[in-house]
């Protein structure tokens, strides 16, 4: 009887010796798996980008750090998108104003942008628009008024800082191919004071 009790005590002591190591190994295994999952996500679904310049101010500023998603992406009006601009030879960030088939009218005299006959909000804009060279001069209706129809497979984008943005109004950018869109901005990670999810709106 005493011998069995001693054996049981020895087994318990042995468990106490091995349990901490097992716990550490389990934790390391879980941590390694979590890192692997994060790597997969940032390889195939998400990526981080840094804003260069002030073309999207006052909503995004130079050096802001953002997370974009490129999983199952179909650009929609109001989305903040990161895309390749072969005219500017760089990656740019802009707001999607129109998608294929949309009719866009920009009136610098009234400081308005219309999409399919509806004036979009300008509450998020930095200042009143100033007239500037546009993508398709043949669509000029009158001084300061321009109209566009977005072709199939393309989008029309503009910076929130209308007077400090090279975008679809410019001959250097023009309409953007949907396939050149790298991702939609979904989250801001820096500055920490503005950390949070990014909503789509126009």
Report residues per predicted region:
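Soluble "head" domains of membrane/secretory-pathway proteins
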Residues: 2-25, 58-202
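Hydrophobic membrane-insertion alpha-helices, especially the h-region
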Residues: 29-45
